[in-house]
């Protein structure tokens, strides 16, 4: 699992999916929020397009560690095209997994399960969870 974890993190760190912000004049129907981890200076700007209680698009820009970048990349893949109710469930179960709390692995895409090792590194919880928690905030204001 450790090698799989490293390989997946490195893959998404070097080639993150859905990375890059949409220009301001093209941001019609997008919600935009920013979050910063004050303990390590990681930060993310998240742009999400919502339509008819669905996540239509996710774009982001990240300054931070490999775990944050990989987490944002996988989140953008796994939650794009989800309805909001399912997205909320996935976010909560992903964060529970990171904290070594009860979660349903069948709700999460297989690649996300490599983040289960974060429970052994509590200092990395915020790195992995920032994009997910920010998206949950965005959903809650819809």
Residue positions per predicted region:
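Domain-level signature for proteins that mediate thiol-based redox and metal-cofactor handling
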Residues: 1-142
